[in-house]
Curated annotation (Swiss-Prot):
Domain of life, per lineage: Eukaryota
Basic residues: bias regions: 169-192
A GO term for molecular function: structural constituent of ribosome
Polar residues: bias regions: 193-203
Record keywords: Ribonucleoprotein, Ribosomal protein
Gene expressing this chain: rpl15
Gene Ontology CC annotation, any one: cytosolic large ribosomal subunit
Protein family: Belongs to the eukaryotic ribosomal protein eL15 family.
Record protein name field: Large ribosomal subunit protein eL15
Region (Disordered): 166-203
GO biological process: cytoplasmic translation
InterPro entries given in the database record: Rbsml_eL15_core_dom_sf (IPR024794), Ribosomal_eL15 (IPR000439), Ribosomal_eL15_CS (IPR020925), Ribosomal_uL23/eL15/eS24_sf (IPR012678)
Length: 203
């Protein structure tokens, strides 16, 4: 069993003394840094490697901080110009994950790189912190590697902005499996609908 397997097992138990201390110290450190900054190496190497990262030229890791909470509707003077049922401004829930937002912001910052994947590293009461794995499509080490050079095709430009990464597909309700396409209006809503008994009031 390799060393990263032990790291993975330690990381699984987030309530353990070791990880709680490590997360608390790292969270303080991340708060002092810029909202988007490049990391010299992944802080979770086991997770990064599972998502496709390789410690070689052409692979880059960026850390990003995203503010937690719902999305407030941008309505000047509270005017939404619609029916009263759609007048909401404050308690609206964004339909994409914060991780997707993180990927999109990093993708805009590093427009010449391609977003491969991302993962959670930390959170506090105000922010969530993610690491985003990016690939340089111009680098020879990437273009010559048959396992990753698919990302060099122009069709994969800004895949994070079009919901083509793992987290983007999740919020779009796209997955594999028999009749998965029947998950109308979200997987949680589908589960609730299929596990709730409803009766006529007068029966």
């Amino acid at each position: 069993m390799g060393a990263l397997k032990y790291v993975e097992e330690i990381q699984k138990k987030k309530q353990s003394d070791v990880i709680r201390f490590l997360l608390r110290v790292r969270c303080w450190e991340l708060r002092q840094l810029n909202a988007i900054h490049r990391a010299s190496r992944p802080s979770r190497p086991d997770k990064a490697r599972r998502l496709g990262y390789k410690a070689k030229q052409g692979y880059v890791v960026y850390r990003i901080r995203v503010r937690r909470g719902g999305r407030k509707r941008p309505a000047p003077k509270g005017a939404t110009y619609g029916k009263p049922t759609n007048m909401g401004i404050n308690q609206l829930k964004y339909q994409r994950a914060l991780r997707a937002t993180a990927e999109e912001r990093v993708g805009r910052r590093c427009a010449n790189l391609r977003v491969l994947n991302s993962y959670w590293i930390n959170q506090d009461s105000t922010y969530k912190y993610f690491e985003v794995i990016l690939v340089d499509p111009q680098h020879k080490a990437i273009r010559r590697d048959a396992r990753i050079n698919w990302i060099c095709n122009a069709v994969h430009k800004h895949r994070e902005a079009r919901g083509l990464t793992a987290t983007g597909k999740k919020s779009r309700g796209i997955n594999k499996g028999h009749r998965y396409n029947n998950t109308r209006s979200g997987r949680r809503h589908t589960w609730k609908r299929q596990n709730t008994q409803s009766y006529w009031r007068y029966r």
